[in-house]
Amino acid sequence: MMGRRERMEELDILAEAKRRFISVLQSRREAGGESIDLEEEVIVSGPLSSREALGQPCREDFPLLRGKEVLMQAVCSGAAGQAFTSDSGRFRGTLADVMQMPLNGSFERAVLIATMNASLRSLGLIEKTVHCKDEGPKRCASCMSEWIEEQDCERVGLIGMQPALLEALIQALGPDKVMISDLAEAGSVRFGVKVLDGMDCSEMFKSCQLILITGSTLANGTVDDLLLKARQHKRRVVFYGTTCAGASFLLGWERWCPCSD
């Protein structure tokens, strides 16, 4: 008989996060606590310009700056939440409208993700839902160098191209102890490490004790298979970034994002 976690992984994990999000709103409303009405307006703007998203970072190789992805921002009940995705667009409607949207494409999934991030932040349940800017990415890389040396792992895998974090991991551990996968940059070599195909990273889960996963996998729909592989190989998973802020709270994921706002 399948356990609760196994049953969840048979579903679309983002759909499960949405179900739990609705449950949080309902339970808080029934308890007389602060909640958000489903008729609350949601405005999703995107894509944000590079200046709006990152300010003036000290490096120019971020995927957003190279046109590999876009950053969308939702505002709900006075709070902002963001989501990286490959598909851009705009949305204006109610929270109920967002909950009724099918999760068929990356745009619709990103609207839901950004909206949950904004809503949960407005309720004070999560923080760090807005990407760091200017010197923030540099500080983030410095934090990663210190953090990874405290972790008990021989090899680490990074899913999703975040060049500052990749460089920090390699400088801390060495290129032989770091693996990287990415959908857009598969086959390239970054900082002496070959980028694996993001759709086929089984070798990473076999070899690495710790897997760092970008929250963007929620929007592109690859997160389900990645978590299944992690469970099969009994690997520790840590999600990083702002995109996964709400889902990490709702699903009990470990998350690392020290420098976001």
Residues covered by each model-derived region:
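Residues in the short beta-alpha loop(s) of Rossmann-like NAD(P)-binding domains
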Residues: 162, 184, 243
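A short SAM/SAH-binding and catalytic strip from SAM-dependent methyltransferases
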Residues: 215-218
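Short acidic low-complexity segments
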Residues: 195-205
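Electropositive, gly/pro-rich neighborhoods at or near active sites that engage anionic ligands
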Residues: 2-163, 168
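Residues at the starts of beta-strands that form the adenosine-phosphate
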Residues: 155, 176-177, 236
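NAD(P)-binding Rossmann-fold cofactor-contacting core
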Residues: 175-189
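An anion/phosphate-binding loop that grips the pyrophosphate of nucleotide cofactors and donors
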Residues: 208
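C-terminal functional extensions of proteins
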Residues: 222-261
